[in-house]
């Protein structure tokens, strides 16, 4: 997938979104180490994605042609640019999120919390739900996690980076805008329903055990589960 690595993020736009939005906006980020302690297989496959390597493109003399097309300076270190960093890390400008002054490896790259929401408020309940299912088969309503800020839909979070340009069809777009637009290069055209299925962008999908039930459920949940790999429990 020709991922658009976007400069010009208004970082707050990422986290005032969808169900559980007010709680998610206030929740601290924790970093993907917490998520990957259980979701090891997903975390391992994520490491090979463009999202995992998002910060690399901000380094000097990397993606030189793309930067020149967008009228950026290829020799500049954009890892220090507050208008760029937010679309290449988790939680920039948010509680517990990535900072330029003290960058944390577990928040570097577009990881778990950029899509699923900042985890502090829901992670404990998420883990307890898994434990309850293993013990007694008890299922947990997804709405309980959504109320705590877990995002089951993702589209707005993706749009906040991939569609944040002048003239964007996304209504949330606002300055500072990304310079990487479809007008600069057609590869920056972003259609969520297509891109979310791009295997080079996302971690592998594995069979879920059925811990959660009900709405809100991601619109491609059943489709992804139909072709998901066998679960790698405890790996």
Curated annotation (Swiss-Prot):
InterPro entries: Cyt_c-552/4, Cytochrome_c-554-like, Multihaem_cyt_sf
Signal peptide: 1-24
Binding positions for heme 1 per the UniProt entry: 35, 38-39, 126
Residue positions binding heme 4: 51, 158, 161-162
Any one Pfam family match given in the protein's UniProt record, by short name: Cytochrome_C554
PROSITE patterns: MULTIHEME_CYTC
Post-translational modification: Binds 4 heme groups per subunit.
Cellular component annotations (GO), alphabetically ordered: periplasmic space
Region: Disordered, residue numbers: 121-144
Localization: Periplasm
Keyword check for Metal-binding: yes
Recorded superkingdom: Bacteria
Keyword entries, A-Z: Electron transport, Heme, Iron, Metal-binding, Periplasm, Signal, Transport
Protein's recorded name: Cytochrome c-554
